[in-house]
From Swiss-Prot:
Part of the 50S ribosomal subunit. Forms a cluster with proteins L3 and L24e, part of which may contact the 16S rRNA in 2 intersubunit bridges. One of its GO terms (biological process) is translation. InterPro entries: Ribosomal_uL14, Ribosomal_uL14_arc, Ribosomal_uL14_CS, Ribosomal_uL14_sf. The lineage of its organism: Archaea, Thermoproteota, Thermoprotei, Thermoproteales, Thermoproteaceae. SUPFAM superfamilies: Ribosomal protein L14. Binds to 23S rRNA. Forms part of two intersubunit bridges in the 70S ribosome. This is Large ribosomal subunit protein uL14.
Length: 144
């Protein structure tokens, strides 16, 4: 007989389905004071790129992506980091039925464990990102 109930992963108590709005090779501004200004998405953590019909990996709010710094401090440029998507232009639907869309796309540079490299986040942060990554919620000034 099949097991009842879904699997829960440790460290990710909230996992909402968010419509992907940021894809491979997207140029995305950085919303923290880590020194990077513009990054290019080169991968999505947890997404196998050669899966369904070679589909291009996409990330939504709250997802971790692999990025390379394109503009910013010289010591950060051409370096590969991980980042969390905190805003996206693409509208997505919340479980209560409301639709959310931001004015711009934005990411926050983090360590591989998920701790932010900067000490402050500029602009609003989506609720889905703060529920999934509590350390980002501590730095967020506005949560939408």
């Amino acid at each position: 007989m099949a097991k009842r109930g879904g699997k829960r992963t440790v460290g990710v108590p909230y996992r909402f389905h968010v419509t992907p709005g940021i894809f491979m090779n997207s140029l995305v501004p950085v919303a923290d004071n880590s020194g990077a200004k513009l990054v290019r998405v080169i991968g999505v953590v947890g997404h196998y790129s050669k899966s369904v019909h070679r589909r291009i990996p996409g990330a939504g709010v709250g997802d971790m992506v692999v990025v390379v710094v394109r503009e910013g401090k010289p010591e950060l440029r051409k370096q590969i980091f991980r980042a969390i998507v905190v805003r996206q232009r693409r509208p997505y639907r919340r479980p209560d039925g409301t639709w959310v869309a931001f004015e711009d796309n934005a990411v926050v540079i983090v360590t591989p464990e998920g701790d932010p490299k900067g000490s402050e986040i500029h602009g609003p942060v989506a609720m889905e990102a703060t529920l999934r990554w509590p350390t980002i919620a501590n730095l967020a000034s506005i949560v939408v």
